[in-house]
């Protein structure tokens, strides 16, 4: 009868939670209206410039004027937009696969990971209490975000590592990606111009003055970043050939050249083509906050015969003091018979220090006397005796050498040239235009941090730093001005699969540690504290000093001699020889008697046993080095990312004011930065009159027959257009701030004003809208159209107004249907996107093709948006790796629901409300709340 195959054990899905860490309680977007005035008011943080007399400095245009005053940075509040717990999403899928177990209780427990506040009242007492730690993904200018973290949330001196990957040059589109669907971005392609206000402001402000602006941009951010670093902290700045010399000089100025650690060169996946010589490498400049106290965890690679670090390992120990020189074939690694543990190099046993009174001037070894020459031996007479008895000495000519085995320290420290970090076609899939290889960031973080440490990345991109930090148990904060980048990063983290490494503070970790150390497992209580690290693979680090100081060698030697010496004397008597130990041959001669052969075999057996015992003692007494990139893994478990929040800067424009509430003109800024709001409005109206407002289809374009100023508080212009019946319609034009976000409250006030003035429709023009404004489509009879302005308009004074190009585009509202499935359960279906038809004044629905992803909070409490279900409609599948790992736990049918316009069924919530958030490929977000 055929044996029935045992079912594979199901994998446990777990996550790491940093219970010992905390973060300040900050407001969610929902709580903005109940914040105290002092929490809402802008804070300015001043950073002192470095004393220019301390060392040589790079000079660029405008720097002297900037140095006349401190660097002053606004520190606006941050708002939580979403709370994401990837394990909740996987648990929900597992329940779907098991068909129908209740999800409410466990989800409630998991979302408690975001709380940790002392009382219910503390929810609205912002910046006063500590909550449980959750990682953070923040949309906004890194300069202001870092200042806010330092000043408002007391993170000054708390960050262990910063990985900064600024734009390598000063070209706009080559550094920014316009859509989640394409990495193909070309300068000069109008279709590929990013429309994100945060990015274009950064570009316009930063690169207006070429390399001079670039250096100002870097110095400002490095100054604020330094303030966040712990005394033991490090910063890594990744940069290309074009500006590496300038960036190094700026970092010398900000951090002090005494805190420079290394300039690392690493090979890129592809070269930069030029007419001269191709560039195949980029650079990482590494500085410490304070070199005397910076944290360093050495990185190693295994030694390979014949390569750098092993060229002297050309000898092979055959045992019993016999050795041979390796052949070229053996050195190349082609010989399978070579035991690399017995390969050794002959190292110097002497030092250049002149001999002093008690130093050994001569040492007898195997019947010959050896002197250290003009120097001295590296150890004393007792140490030399231990080396001799340990089989660690070898004469070469008139010199006595130290036998250093490859296995004594089988790794070599990684230097500052990395040729093993390139992304290959079979490794990570690249999703973002300037995505850095994961192995580069991984190595940097592992050298400068421990599990539980905080890592910050001011240029998030596709979220590689966050992904690496999450994998290795580090806490993380990542910042980007690009909505597209954060959309990609969020999907990447939500669907990521990580190995489950054995925690040192766990029962399994204690057992593994005991195996490695040869001791009995500890009985101490365990708490799964990440800060205590993982259990790592380790390698011995046997040194000359440790062998020289090993007194146990004498004990083993003397004990073995009780057997060896009588056998040696007996062998000499049988063969009529006077052999000393080192003279006894390894092989027998044909003319020996049977008794002599037996004695010879017994002696060599005891001799080899003595050496094994001494080798074991040497290994046991030696230090070891952890391989921090090789923790032990529990294959029965799979890990998903821990809880994280998606946040953004204050939705209000932040202006710096003095004590008299007058606007402050920031030093070093040009006149165009301080132009009146009226100038900005006039530029927008001029372009609006020429370009009109475009929707998804050309036939839906609103073309103005006239556009005249209007003296309102919020409405600034009266626009006229005609519908299909040639009836003239009046549109009130509301223009949002040049750098800021329009909120729902802004639209409500503007719509009321439009109704009072008898307009037919309100057209709001803004660079960005908050997610809550998405519900505001109509106020009474007034239809509200939200047009997103093209980022080109930030630079409108430099652009020719041709009326061509979609400068004002409406992202239609998602059309959502709530389906009652019976038994107290409901489903949500995204039907498409609603588009306003100006020719008819009606709304038409298009399909969901423009939607990248959509999320549901199935029990919305009007305090926070929890992502309880997530769906990804694009071609990229963020759950690809998890699907492979969890085949047995979650069936294909359940996985398929993640790429769907219809949600999985869920219980009607006790709160009576659900919230649906929809994100398009440009990173725009809209959120709708429904009563169910």
Language model regions located:
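S-adenosyl-L-methionine-dependent nucleic acid methyltransferase catalytic domains
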Residues: 1-295, 305-310, 316, 365, ...
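N-terminal auxiliary segments of SAM/dcSAM-dependent transferases
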Residues: 301-409
């Amino acid at each position: 009868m055929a044996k029935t195959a045992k079912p594979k054990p199901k994998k446990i899905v777990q996550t790491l939670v940093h219970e010992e860490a905390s973060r300040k309680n900050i407001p969610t977007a929902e709580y903005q209206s109940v914040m105290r005035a002092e929490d809402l008011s802008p804070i300015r943080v001043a950073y002192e410039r470095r004393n220019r007399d301390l060392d040589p400095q790079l000079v660029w245009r405008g720097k002297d004027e900037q140095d006349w005053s401190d660097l002053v940075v606004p520190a606006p509040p941050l708002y939580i937009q979403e709370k994401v717990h990837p394990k909740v999403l996987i648990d929900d899928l597992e329940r779907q696969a098991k068909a129908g177990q209740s999800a409410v209780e466990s989800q409630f427990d998991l979302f408690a990971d975001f709380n940790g506040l002392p009382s219910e009242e503390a929810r609205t007492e912002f910046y006063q209490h500590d909550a449980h730690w959750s990682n953070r993904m923040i949309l906004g200018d890194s300069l202001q975000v870092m200042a806010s973290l330092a000043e408002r949330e007391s993170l000054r001196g708390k960050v262990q590592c910063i990985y900064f990957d600024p734009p390598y040059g000063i070209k706009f589109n080559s550094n920014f990606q316009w859509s989640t669907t394409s990495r193909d971005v070309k300068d000069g392609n109008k279709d590929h111009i990013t429309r994100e206000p945060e990015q274009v402001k950064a570009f316009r402000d930063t690169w207006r003055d070429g390399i001079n602006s670039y250096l100002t941009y870097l110095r400002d951010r490095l100054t604020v970043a330094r303030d966040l670093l712990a005394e033991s902290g490090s910063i890594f700045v990744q940069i290309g050939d074009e500006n590496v010399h300038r960036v190094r000089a700026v970092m010398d100025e900000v951090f002090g050249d005494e805190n420079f650690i290394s300039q690392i060169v690493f090979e890129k996946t592809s070269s930069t083509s030029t007419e001269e010589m191709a560039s195949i490498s980029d650079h990482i400049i590494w500085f410490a906050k304070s070199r005397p106290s910076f944290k360093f965890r050495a990185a190693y690679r295994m030694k390979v015969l014949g390569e750098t670090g092993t060229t002297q390992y050309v000898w092979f120990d055959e045992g019993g003091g016999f050795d041979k020189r390796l052949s070229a074939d053996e050195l190349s690694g082609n010989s399978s018979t070579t035991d690399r543990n017995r390969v050794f190099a002959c190292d110097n046993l002497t030092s250049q220090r002149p001999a002093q009174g008690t130093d050994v001037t001569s040492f007898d070894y195997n019947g010959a006397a050896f002197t250290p020459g003009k120097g001295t031996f590296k150890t004393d007479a007792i140490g030399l005796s231990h080396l001799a008895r340990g089989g660690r000495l070898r004469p070469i000519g008139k010199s006595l050498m130290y036998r250093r085995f490859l296995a004594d320290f089988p790794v070599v420290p990684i230097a500052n040239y990395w040729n093993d970090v390139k992304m290959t076609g079979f490794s990570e899939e690249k999703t973002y235009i300037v995505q850095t290889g994961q192995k580069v960031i991984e190595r940097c973080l592992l050298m400068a941090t421990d599990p539980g440490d905080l890592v910050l990345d001011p240029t998030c991109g596709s979220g590689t730093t966050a992904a690496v930090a999450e994998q290795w148990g580090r806490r993380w904060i990542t910042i980007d001005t690009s909505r597209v980048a954060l959309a990609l990063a969020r999907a990447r983290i939500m669907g990521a699969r990580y190995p489950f490494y054995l925690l040192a503070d766990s029962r399994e970790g204690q057992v593994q540690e005991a195996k490695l150390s040869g001791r009995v497992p500890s009985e101490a209580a365990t708490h799964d504290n990440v800060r205590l690290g993982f259990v790592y693979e380790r390698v011995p680090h046997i040194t000359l000093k440790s062998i020289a100081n090993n007194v146990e060698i004498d004990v083993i030697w003397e004990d073995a001699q009780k057997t060896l010496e009588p056998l040696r004397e007996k062998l000499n008597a049988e063969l009529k020889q006077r052999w000393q130990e080192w003279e006894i041959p390894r092989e027998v001669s044909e003319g020996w008697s049977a008794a002599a052969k037996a004695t010879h075999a017994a002696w060599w057996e005891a001799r080899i046993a003595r050496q094994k015992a001494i080798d074991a003692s040497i290994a046991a007494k030696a230090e070891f080095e952890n391989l921090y990139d090789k923790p032990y893994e529990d294959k029965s478990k799979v890990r998903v990312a821990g809880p994280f929040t998606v946040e953004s800067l204050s939705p209000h424009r932040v202006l710096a004011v003095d004590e008299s509430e007058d606007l402050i003109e920031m030093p070093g800024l040009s006149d165009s930065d301080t132009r009146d709001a009226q100038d900005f409005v006039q530029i927008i109206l001029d372009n609006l009159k020429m370009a009109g407002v475009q929707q998804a289809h050309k036939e839906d374009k609103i073309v103005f027959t006239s556009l005249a100023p209007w003296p309102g508080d919020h409405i600034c212009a009266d626009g006229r257009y005609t519908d299909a019946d040639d009836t003239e319609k009046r549109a009130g034009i509301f223009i949002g701030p040049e750098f800021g976000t329009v909120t729902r409250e802004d639209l409500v006030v503007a719509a009321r004003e439009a109704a009072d003035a008898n307009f037919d429709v309100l057209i709001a023009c803004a660079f960005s809208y908050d997610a809550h404004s998405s519900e505001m489509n109509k106020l009474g009879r007034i239809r509200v159209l939200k047009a997103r302005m093209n980022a080109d308009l930030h630079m409108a004074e430099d652009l020719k107004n041709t009326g061509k190009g979609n400068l004002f585009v409406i992202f239609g509202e998602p059309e959502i249907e709530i389906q009652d499935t019976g038994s107290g359960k409901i489903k949500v279906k995204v039907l498409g996107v609603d588009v306003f038809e100006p020719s008819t004044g009606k709304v038409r629905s298009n399909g969901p093709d423009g939607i990248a992803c959509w999320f549901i909070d199935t029990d919305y409490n009007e305090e926070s948006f929890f992502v309880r279900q997530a769906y990804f409609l694009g071609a990229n599948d963020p759950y690809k790796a998890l699907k492979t790992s969890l085949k047995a736990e979650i069936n294909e049918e359940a996985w398929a629901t993640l790429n769907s316009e219809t949600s999985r069924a869920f219980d009607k919530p006790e709160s009576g409300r659900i919230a649906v958030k929809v994100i398009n490929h440009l990173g725009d977000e809209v959120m709708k709340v429904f009563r169910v």
